[in-house]
Amino acid sequence: VLSPADKSNVKAAWGKVGGHAGDYGAEALERMFLSFPTTKTYFPHFDLSHGSAQVKGHGKKVADALTVAVAHVDDMPNALSALSDLHAHKLRVDPVNFKLLSHCLLVTLAAHLPADFTPAVHASLDKFLASVSTVLTSKYR
């Protein structure tokens, strides 16, 4: 459960991401594909090369979903319901992949926002991404 301090940290950190959200989302995906090659199996139709339009497009989708989650941090299950349905019933993404992408997002944010990525902010973002992952996998049952 996210504390009020966690919510404040997440909103502040995501606010600093600003217009770079799509780029950071794409970078996190690239990190995931390089670090965890098995994740590529969910994207057989994508050009997974560095800077590809498809990876950039999906990175923007990831970032947009996180922006929605930040804006609706107190009601993520409703805000992300359609996305949860998509990943559970149509895409059938193995839930472990959300943890892998979350890790890559944390690394990307730490690399781009080093002065803002304090231990407290890191912990809050980690809890937030775990909450998003839980919501996205909630309909697998």
Curated annotation (Swiss-Prot):
<keyword id="KW-0597">Phosphoprotein</keyword>
<dbReference type="InterPro" id="IPR050056">
    <property type="entry name" value="Hemoglobin_oxygen_transport"/>
</dbReference>
<comment type="similarity">
    <text>Belongs to the globin family.</text>
</comment>
<feature type="modified residue" description="N6-succinyllysine">
    <location>
        <position position="40"/>
    </location>
</feature>
<dbReference type="GO" id="GO:0031720">
    <property type="term" value="F:haptoglobin binding"/>
</dbReference>
<feature type="modified residue" description="Phosphoserine">
    <location>
        <position position="102"/>
    </location>
</feature>
<dbReference type="GO" id="GO:0005506">
    <property type="term" value="F:iron ion binding"/>
</dbReference>
<keyword id="KW-0007">Acetylation</keyword>
<feature type="modified residue" description="N6-succinyllysine; alternate">
    <location>
        <position position="16"/>
    </location>
</feature>
<dbReference type="InterPro" id="IPR012292">
    <property type="entry name" value="Globin/Proto"/>
</dbReference>
<dbReference type="InterPro" id="IPR000971">
    <property type="entry name" value="Globin"/>
</dbReference>
<keyword id="KW-0408">Iron</keyword>
<dbReference type="GO" id="GO:0004601">
    <property type="term" value="F:peroxidase activity"/>
</dbReference>
<dbReference type="InterPro" id="IPR002338">
    <property type="entry name" value="Hemoglobin_a-typ"/>
</dbReference>
<feature type="modified residue" description="Phosphoserine">
    <location>
        <position position="124"/>
    </location>
</feature>
<feature type="modified residue" description="N6-succinyllysine">
    <location>
        <position position="7"/>
    </location>
</feature>
<feature type="modified residue" description="Phosphoserine">
    <location>
        <position position="138"/>
    </location>
</feature>
<keyword id="KW-0561">Oxygen transport</keyword>
<dbReference type="GO" id="GO:0031838">
    <property type="term" value="C:haptoglobin-hemoglobin complex"/>
</dbReference>
<feature type="modified residue" description="N6-succinyllysine">
    <location>
        <position position="11"/>
    </location>
</feature>
<dbReference type="GO" id="GO:0005344">
    <property type="term" value="F:oxygen carrier activity"/>
</dbReference>
<keyword id="KW-0349">Heme</keyword>
<feature type="modified residue" description="Phosphoserine">
    <location>
        <position position="35"/>
    </location>
</feature>
<dbReference type="GO" id="GO:0043177">
    <property type="term" value="F:organic acid binding"/>
</dbReference>
<feature type="modified residue" description="Phosphotyrosine">
    <location>
        <position position="24"/>
    </location>
</feature>
<feature type="modified residue" description="Phosphoserine">
    <location>
        <position position="131"/>
    </location>
</feature>
<feature type="modified residue" description="Phosphothreonine">
    <location>
        <position position="137"/>
    </location>
</feature>
<feature type="modified residue" description="N6-acetyllysine; alternate">
    <location>
        <position position="16"/>
    </location>
</feature>
<dbReference type="GO" id="GO:0005833">
    <property type="term" value="C:hemoglobin complex"/>
</dbReference>
<keyword id="KW-0813">Transport</keyword>
<feature type="binding site">
    <location>
        <position position="58"/>
    </location>
    <ligand>
        <name>O2</name>
    </ligand>
</feature>
<feature type="modified residue" description="Phosphoserine">
    <location>
        <position position="3"/>
    </location>
</feature>
<protein>
    <recommendedName>
        <fullName>Hemoglobin subunit alpha</fullName>
    </recommendedName>
</protein>
<feature type="modified residue" description="Phosphoserine">
    <location>
        <position position="49"/>
    </location>
</feature>
<dbReference type="GO" id="GO:0042744">
    <property type="term" value="P:hydrogen peroxide catabolic process"/>
</dbReference>
<comment type="subunit">
    <text>Heterotetramer of two alpha chains and two beta chains.</text>
</comment>
<dbReference type="GO" id="GO:0072562">
    <property type="term" value="C:blood microparticle"/>
</dbReference>
<comment type="function">
    <text>Involved in oxygen transport from the lung to the various peripheral tissues.</text>
</comment>
<feature type="modified residue" description="Phosphothreonine">
    <location>
        <position position="134"/>
    </location>
</feature>
<dbReference type="Pfam" id="PF00042">
    <property type="entry name" value="Globin"/>
</dbReference>
<dbReference type="GO" id="GO:0019825">
    <property type="term" value="F:oxygen binding"/>
</dbReference>
<keyword id="KW-0479">Metal-binding</keyword>
